[in-house]
């Protein structure tokens, strides 16, 4: 029998938002377990930082300074490596637990920590490899950029101008605004291209520690290469997942920073800024809050990375592309049932329409909503920037024709119009799209989610306006809305609660993706009903075959070959076919099975 799937919904690749949703869902389900690992992990770092000062004080108090320094440096180096190694190992243990659960190979926290702790030094090797790679990359890019700019500057006569008149270049730019603008745009383009390229490269190495922390046969150097392989064709998917997960953890950082600031103001205000004892308490409190922040955010981040690693393996290697059984129905024991987890990775809601029809939807979740909000806010910011830019140009021209005694009144009008326009753009954007596009803004469309009423009907103008008016409260540091979405049973923010709306996921229909079918497969499909028993295939079996055919071009070459041969062997056994006809590849056989099943096996 093939391994059963504890989460059948993971057969298809996850969207960036759902990757985050699944990670948070698993974190909440295993809060005690993952947080316990985070606490023990942070203790290694906190202990190192706390004990460093008294240890150094004792050494310098007992020994001569030169000898103390010679002893402290190697000792501190070894302790730092060991403690940070345990920190990295503990972080990887959380991702390992997530990956194992999604794979159906459940493991205890004790076993996961034992595995990663035994490899603690290897995580440092991975870090050193990355440091060397990125250092070489930075130096190479810097030198190449310097050479290119020097050649351009020289070809334009810049060096000669500097020798004759050091300020001549600046004077030339002042006399020629077009040249200055072109230079500015060129520099801006270089910065944008460099940022995009750097982000892409960073994404390719974003999961370097996970193969080493999860796969027993993987060495540190191999782990770096495996990250590069798995993120091929998925770099921007990885960027979106990591960016959204960072956005979700902003509220935690903001709240802790607010608490730290309030505590500092209170203590300093009561005792004065010159009181060294109070300052020590403030620093210790800030340190404790910082460690608390790591305890909260570390398991969230590592849970999401564990889901991301699983999803990348599924995308590139087809982890879930296995038939749930290897034998025909008449040979499978009657007491064998698919193993499903009792945990729902994606929360569902059942609505009753005015026509008394029950509809089931998957809620959008905080991951998809954060991704949509990010895109929408970028578009709103772009619109506001254009409004202020052209508004400023218009105001500047208008002021030149006004008399000086009207300047004060004009400025007040300009400010009022600016704020009114900003409000209309920021609120009207959401009202307009949600009303006219059936609850979808461009961001929601990208994230494949939409807003509906509590009874399943499309949102109207009233609901869209209420949601838009309350959005500033929900979006303040992403705190209010995020907290409500996480803890409300229907994942509603304040605007949803008042407007009576829900944010749901659109159904992702995998059948819409085209499948290239060969002539040989179509010919074999017509023969299969007489050569085999296609009725032995179950819908779940067909779904796996279809998923492979749709995704085979995105798999690695080795994974595609292995999966194709394995699925062909399993399917051949299921349909009682003795051998695959000569000259037919495993891919062509699966294509024929796909066609024959769709035709009803006749």
Question: Where does each model-flagged region fall?
Answer:
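Short, small/hydrophobic-residue-rich motifs at membrane-helix boundaries and re-entrant hairpins
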Residues: 2-104, 114, 122, 126-173, ...
């Amino acid at each position: 029998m093939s391994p059963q799937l504890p989460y059948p919904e993971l057969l298809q690749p996850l969207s960036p938002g759902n990757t985050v949703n699944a990670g948070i869902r698993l974190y909440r389900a295993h809060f005690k377990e993952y947080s316990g690992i985070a606490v023990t992990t942070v203790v290694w770092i906190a202990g190192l930082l706390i004990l460093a000062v008294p240890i150094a004080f004792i050494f310098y108090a007992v020994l001569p300074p030169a000898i103390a320094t010679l002893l402290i440096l190697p000792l501190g180096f070894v302790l730092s490596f060991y403690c940070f190694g345990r920190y990295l190992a503990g972080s990887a243990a959380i991702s390992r637990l997530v990956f194992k659960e999604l794979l159906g190979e459940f493991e205890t926290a004790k076993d996961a920590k034992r595995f990663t702790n035994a490899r603690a030094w290897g995580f440092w090797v991975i870090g050193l490899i990355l440091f060397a790679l990125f250092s070489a990359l930075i130096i190479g890019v810097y030198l190449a950029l310097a050479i290119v700019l020097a050649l351009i500057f020289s070809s334009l006569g810049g060096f000669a101008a500097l020798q004759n008149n050091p300020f001549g270049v600046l004077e030339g730019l002042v006399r020629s605004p077009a040249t200055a603008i072109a230079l500015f745009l060129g520099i801006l383009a270089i910065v944008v291209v460099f940022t995009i390229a750097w982000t892409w490269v960073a994404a390719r190495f974003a999961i370097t520690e996970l193969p080493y922390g999860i796969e027993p046969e993987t060495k540190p150097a191999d782990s770096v290469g495996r990250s590069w392989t798995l993120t091929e064709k998925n770099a921007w998917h990885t960027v979106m997942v990591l960016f959204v997960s960072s956005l979700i953890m902003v509220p935690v950082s903001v709240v802790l920073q607010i608490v730290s600031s309030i505590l500092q103001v209170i203590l300093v205000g009561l005792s004065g800024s010159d009181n060294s004892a109070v300052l020590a308490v403030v620093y210790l409190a800030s340190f404790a809050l910082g460690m608390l922040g790591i305890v909260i955010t570390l398991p969230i981040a590592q849970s999401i990375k564990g889901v991301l690693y699983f999803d990348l393996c599924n995308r590139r290697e087809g982890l879930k592309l296995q038939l749930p059984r290897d034998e025909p129905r008449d040979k499978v024991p009657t007491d064998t049932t698919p193993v499903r987890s009792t945990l729902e990775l994606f929360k569902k809601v059942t609505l009753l329409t005015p026509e008394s029809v029950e509809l089931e939807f998957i809620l959008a979740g905080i991951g998809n909503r954060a991704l949509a909000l990010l895109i929408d806010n970028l578009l709103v910011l772009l619109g506001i920037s254009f409004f202020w830019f052209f508004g400023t140009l218009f105001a500047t021209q208008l002021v030149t024709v006004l008399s000086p005694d009207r300047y004060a009144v004009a400025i007040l009008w300009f400010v009022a119009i600016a704020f009114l326009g900003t409000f209309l753009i920021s609120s009207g954007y959401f009202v307009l799209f949600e009303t006219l596009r059936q609850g979808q803004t461009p961001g929601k469309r990208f994230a494949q989610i939409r807003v509906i009423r509590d009874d399943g009907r499309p949102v109207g103008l009233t609901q869209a306006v209420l949601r838009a008016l309350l959005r500033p409260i929900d979006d303040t540091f992403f705190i209010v809305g995020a907290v409500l979405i996480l803890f409300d049973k229907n994942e509603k923010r304040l605007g949803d609660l008042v407007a009576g709306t829900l944010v749901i996921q659109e159904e992702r229909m995998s059948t819409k993706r085209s499948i290239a079918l060969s002539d040989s497969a179509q010919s074999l499909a017509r023969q299969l009903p007489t050569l085999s028993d296609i009725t032995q295939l179950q819908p779940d079996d067909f779904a796996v075959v279809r998923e492979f055919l749709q995704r085979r071009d995105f798999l690695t070459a080795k994974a595609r070959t292995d999966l194709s041969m394995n699925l062909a062997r399993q399917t051949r056994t299921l349909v009682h076919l003795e051998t695959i006809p000569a000259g037919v590849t495993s891919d062509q056989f699966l294509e024929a099975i796909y066609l024959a099943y769709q035709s009803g096996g006749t």
